[in-house]
């Protein structure tokens, strides 16, 4: 039993282990398959990676993707007007397409750093072609200075990392940019573009040296623009970059459908052998706009551009021969009435039973206009057979021959003749068309190589084959410079070709492009019709003047030759009407009967042609000009010449046709010419009679046979009747009557009557004399004005001279003031020297007084010494000097203060006591001191000191008086009064200073009141020194 249980356990464990191994193997296989899928997505090479490397690469990729997403969110448009399901790039592309604009970034030196792809549809340039150009290369030359001024005075510049852009940083300007494209248009083809953007500092752009700029490094142009060469001093910030959008103000509707998703730019369709739609792919509606049920059963040719039909037909012929192929670039009309460029790869699918062609499978691919431009440039470089013919700068003929592997096509482009004059120059047209004939002879051997409008008689050719015509008017030729004062002429193109190639224009829209073969005529404006009518009137006037001149010359002949003259006039008239190259507007032409005969042999008129005629060429459309229909001879009621080869002049009998067939239009035209001929004949006869009368009168007046005309009076009714009668007789004569209704005769110096010519000469002489008098008076007036201006200039110079003299006087006064200041400084120095001498004397006096004070040692007055000085006379003299000047001069006041401050130091109490005693004895000898002075020597010493003191004070007073006199003299010289001389506040201050101090003690001596008052008033005249 134990063995059986062990066996059961083993089998269970085995089964569990086996199932576990299977599940692990399944998990490993699934993990390996996932790792292989990741390696196929991550790895960029065919080398096999291990599992760990695949996982590491996946983690790194996810990190980078998340970081890029976070970075893009910073610059993502967060406004509400942007749909959430559109990315930033898609929304920007759609905005540019809807605004008909493009983005451009260029530096201050003009180098273009970036241009969006939408510039190709707007101006016809590829973005990579613009990177080697500058904005000055595209801009109109007259706008270069405005562009330079914009960069020299920029608006507030945005920093490199600044994201908040306000309207204050925005700048708007207009300029004209040259158009590009497949065809080399004129140099004047410019479009007005509005730029809106801002300036930004580019940290990557360095200023660089001149050598770097010349080498084209650091984003600078290799060659400086012409505006910088003309203005070498112009300084612009080379780190400045303009970022903005440009919008063409008059869009030329150059569009191709922009496909955002690159995977949805092709679709598939099936066509029958008659090229009708049998099937349309589900990818087609987003591209062409049509649903499958809308196009099934319709022909593909209904959606192709008219200019591309010939190349498409040639490609389909090649498809029928080879069974497969690739079409050229062609335009397809979408449901939104836009033209998109397509290229198709197709092959023929055969029936499985009878092996006959069943249908054609086409794979259509949308191509951009840039690719079309590249392909056209490559073909142009390969062919190299384009030639341009220019005559006098007024007409331009472009003959180009393009060869390809699919179909050989020869295309000749004829620009309209732009004639500066109103009349058509036949020689210019003949030369241009002669060159055209030689150019097309190589590609079309069946066409006669003689010029279409040849003025020489050429032998008729055996055969004449005229190729069909095609005309188109591209939208790019609407106007070269729009919205400006420059509006060049519009161009029209006429094509001559045998097999039409891919010569379509890239600038067509459904609204202005030709969509059917019947609309082949070019547009003739009313202005051109007016020019042709003016041309006819001009020739009629010329014919009238010529006949008039001839008749004047023939009046001297005899009357016998009148019939012969009339015959000659008729011949001249016929020659003029036949030989004049006039374009006659066409009236509605009815059906005509065709004569049997050769294709290019036209019956001639019944009379010989005086000169070879010029007939409008056959490439011009029938609705515009009266011409012969190619390949179908028609008899005209007036003399014409064959279009390609006029026949030589033959006899009248040989050129008479058997039958003449005329349309109603031709018969009507013949009637008009006959009536005009009759009117001209009558007019010629009338003029002959008038000229004969005038010549007779002139002859009589020359020999004074004609008497002066008498005065005649006319009534108003008679005057009008006579005037009307004369006008009816002559048609061009006018009558002028004076106010008195009389003709006033005039006579010359010999007494002969003056005729009208002499009277006119006299009037002209009088007019000349009046003009000379007027010129003389004007000259005198000009001389007077010049004299007045000369006198005004003299007065002005005198005033300037007076001003200069006044300035010189002011300078002299300033110099005098400086000299006076120097003198005052010298006086101050002298006073300081005198004060020093006085101080030395005071020191000697003080030494003697100290001896006396030491002996006495008395101090009755304590407060009096602070206000008194040793020299009362000096103080009183200073006070008098100050009161005399009265503050008239601040410098003098300062000198007085300096004098007061330079007094000797104050004495002590003993000195003051001695001074009081001296003053008391001087004032009154009756003062009794209760002290005895026993020393006799002291009295004698005091007397000596007094004598010295009085002599020093006298010297000081004399010096002060001299100073006062000098100051008075200076005041008289300056002649100016000072405000401070009459200032009462300064005097009041001095008076306040003269008052007694309040801290004086009562003297303990016996003296009278008057003596005490004199005692205390005399030493305090100048207390300012103690303050």
Curated annotation (Swiss-Prot):
Residues 377-402, 443-575, 765-800, 869-911, 926-1027 are annotated as: Disordered. PROSITE patterns: BHLH (PS50888), PAS (PS50112). It comes from Drosophila melanogaster. InterPro entries: bHLH_dom, CLOCK-like, HLH_DNA-bd_sf, Nuc_translocat, PAC, PAS, PAS-like_dom_sf. Residues 15-65 form the bHLH domain. It is found in: Nucleus. This is Circadian locomoter output cycles protein kaput. Signal peptide: none annotated. Residues 443-486, 1006-1027 have a biased composition (Polar residues). Residues 780-1027 are annotated as: Implicated in the circadian rhythmicity. The record marks 20, 24, 28 as: Interaction with E-box DNA. Efficient DNA binding requires dimerization with another bHLH protein. Forms a heterodimer with Cycle. GO terms for biological process: behavioral response to cocaine; circadian regulation of gene expression; circadian regulation of heart rate; circadian rhythm; eclosion rhythm; entrainment of circadian clock; locomotor rhythm; negative regulation of apoptotic process. It comes from the Eukaryota. GO terms for molecular function: chromatin binding; DNA binding; DNA-binding transcription factor activity, RNA polymerase II-specific; protein heterodimerization activity; RNA polymerase II cis-regulatory region sequence-specific DNA binding. Residues 383-402, 504-516, 552-575, 871-909, 951-995 have a biased composition (Low complexity). Circadian regulator that acts as a transcription factor and generates a rhythmic output with a period of about 24 hours. Oscillates in antiphase to the cycling observed for period (PER) and timeless (TIM). According to PubMed:9742131, reaches peak abundance within several hours of the dark-light transition at ZT0 (zeitgeber 0), whereas PubMed:9616122 describes bimodal oscillating expression with maximum at ZT5 and ZT23. Clock-cycle heterodimers activate cycling transcription of PER and TIM by binding to the E-box (5'-CACGTG-3') present in their promoters.
């Amino acid at each position: 039993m134990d063995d059986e249980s062990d066996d059961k356990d083993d089998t269970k464990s085995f089964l569990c282990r086996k199932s576990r191994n299977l599940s692990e193997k399944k998990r490993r296989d699934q993990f390996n398959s996932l790792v292989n899928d990741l390696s196929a997505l991550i790895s960029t090479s065919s080398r096999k990676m291990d599992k760990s490397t695949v996982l590491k690469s996946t983690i790194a990729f996810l990190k980078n993707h998340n970081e890029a997403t976070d970075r893009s969110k910073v610059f993502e448009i967060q406004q509400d007007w942007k749909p959430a399901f559109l990315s930033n790039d898609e929304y920007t592309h759609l905005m540019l397409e809807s605004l008909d604009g493009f983005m451009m970034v260029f530096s201050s030196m003009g180098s273009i750093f970036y241009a969006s792809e939408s510039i190709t549809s707007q101006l016809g340039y590829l973005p990579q072609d613009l990177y080697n150009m500058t904005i000055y290369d595209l801009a109109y030359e007259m706008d270069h200075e405005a562009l330079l001024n914009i960069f020299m005075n920029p608006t507030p510049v945005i920093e490199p990392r600044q994201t908040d852009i306000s309207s204050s940083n925005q700048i708007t300007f207009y300029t004209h940019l040259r158009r590009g494209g497949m065809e080399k248009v004129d140099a004047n083809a410019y479009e007005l573009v509005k730029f809106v953007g801002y300036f930004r500092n580019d940290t990557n752009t360095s200023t660089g040296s001149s050598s770097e700029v010349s080498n084209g490094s650091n984003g600078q142009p290799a060659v400086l623009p012409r505006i910088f060469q003309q203005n070498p001093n112009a300084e612009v910030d080379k780190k400045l970059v303009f970022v903005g959008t440009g919008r063409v103000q008059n869009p030329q509707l150059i569009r191709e459908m922009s496909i955002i998703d690159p995977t949805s730019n092709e679709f598939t369709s099936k066509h029958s052998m008659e090229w009708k739609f049998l099937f349309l792919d589900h990818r087609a509606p987003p591209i062409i706009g049509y649903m499958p049920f809308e196009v099934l059963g319709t022909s593909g040719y209904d959606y192709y551009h008219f200019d591309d039909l010939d190349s498409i037909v040639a490609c389909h012929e090649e498809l029928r021969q080879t069974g497969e192929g690739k079409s050229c670039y062609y335009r397809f009309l979408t449901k939104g009435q836009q033209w998109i460029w397509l290229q198709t790869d197709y092959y023929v699918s055969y029936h499985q039973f009878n092996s006959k062609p069943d249908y054609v499978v086409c794979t259509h691919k949308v191509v951009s206009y840039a690719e079309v431009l590249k392909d056209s440039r490559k073909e142009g470089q390969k062919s190299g057979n384009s030639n341009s013919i220019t005559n006098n700068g007024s007409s331009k003929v472009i003959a180009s021959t393009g060869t390809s592997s699919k179909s050989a096509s020869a295309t000749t482009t004829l620009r309209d003749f732009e004639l500066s004059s109103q009349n058509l120059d036949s020689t210019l047209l003949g030369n241009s068309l002669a060159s055209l004939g030689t150019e097309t002879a190589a590609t079309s051997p069946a066409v006669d190589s003689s010029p279409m409008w040849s003025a020489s008689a050429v032998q008729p050719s055996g055969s004449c084959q005229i190729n069909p015509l095609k005309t188109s008017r591209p939208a790019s030729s609407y106007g070269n410079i729009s919205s400006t004062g420059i509006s060049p002429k519009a161009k029209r193109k006429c094509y001559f070709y045998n097999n039409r190639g891919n010569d379509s224009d890239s600038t067509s829209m459904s609204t202005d492009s030709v969509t059917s073969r019947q609309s082949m005529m070019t547009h003739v404006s009313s202005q051109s019709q007016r020019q042709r009518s003016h041309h006819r009137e001009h020739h009629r006037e010329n014919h009238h003047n010529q006949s008039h001149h001839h008749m004047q010359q023939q009046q001297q002949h005899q009357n016998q030759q009148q019939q012969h003259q009339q015959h000659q006039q008729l011949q001249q008239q016929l020659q003029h009407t036949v030989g004049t190259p006039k374009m006659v507007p066409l009236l509605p032409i009815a059906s005509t009967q065709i004569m049997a005969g050769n294709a290019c042999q036209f019956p001639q008129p019944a009379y010989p042609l005086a000169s070879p005629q010029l007939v409008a060429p056959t490439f011009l459309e029938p609705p515009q000009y009266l011409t012969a229909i190619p390949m179908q001879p028609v008899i005209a009621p007036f003399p014409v010449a064959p279009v390609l080869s006029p026949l030589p002049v033959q006899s009248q009998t040989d050129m008479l046709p058997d039958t003449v067939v005329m349309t109603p239009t031709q018969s009507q035209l013949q009637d008009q010419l006959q009536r005009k001929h009759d009117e001209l004949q009558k007019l010629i006869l009338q003029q002959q009679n008038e000229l004969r009368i005038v010549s007779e009168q002139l002859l009589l007046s020359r020999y004074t046979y004609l008497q002066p005309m008498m005065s005649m009076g006319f009534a108003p009714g008679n005057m009008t009747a006579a005037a009307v009668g004369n006008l009816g007789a002559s048609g061009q004569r006018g009558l002028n009557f004076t106010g008195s209704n009389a003709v006033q005769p005039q006579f010359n110096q010999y007494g002969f009557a003056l005729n009208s010519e002499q009277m006119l000469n006299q009037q002209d002489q009088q007019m000349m004399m009046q003009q000379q008098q007027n010129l003389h008076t004007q000259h005198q007036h000009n001389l007077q004005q010049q004299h007045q201006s000369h006198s005004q200039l003299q007065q002005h110079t005198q005033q300037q001279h007076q001003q200069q003299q006044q300035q010189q006087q002011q300078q002299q006064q300033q110099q005098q003031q400086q000299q006076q200041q120097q003198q005052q400084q010298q006086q101050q120095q002298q006073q300081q020297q005198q004060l020093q001498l006085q101080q030395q004397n005071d020191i000697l006096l003080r030494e003697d007084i100290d001896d006396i004070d030491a002996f006495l040692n008395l101090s009755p007055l304590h407060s009096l010494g602070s206000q008194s000085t040793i020299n009362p006379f000096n103080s009183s003299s200073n006070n008098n000097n100050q009161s005399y000047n009265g503050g008239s001069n601040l410098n003098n006041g300062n000198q007085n203060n300096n004098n007061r401050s330079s007094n000797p130091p104050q004495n002590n109490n003993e000195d003051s006591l001695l001074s009081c005693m001296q003053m008391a004895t001087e004032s009154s000898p009756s003062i009794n001191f209760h002290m005895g002075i026993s020393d006799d020597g002291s009295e004698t010493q005091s007397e000596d000191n007094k004598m010295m003191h009085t002599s020093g004070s006298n010297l000081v007073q004399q010096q002060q008086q001299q100073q006062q006199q000098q100051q008075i003299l200076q005041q008289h010289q300056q002649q100016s009064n000072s405000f401070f001389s009459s200032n009462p506040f300064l005097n009041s201050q001095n008076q306040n200073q003269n008052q007694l101090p309040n801290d004086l003690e009562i003297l303990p001596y016996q003296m009278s009141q008057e003596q005490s008052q004199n005692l205390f008033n005399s030493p305090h005249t100048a207390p300012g020194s103690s303050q």
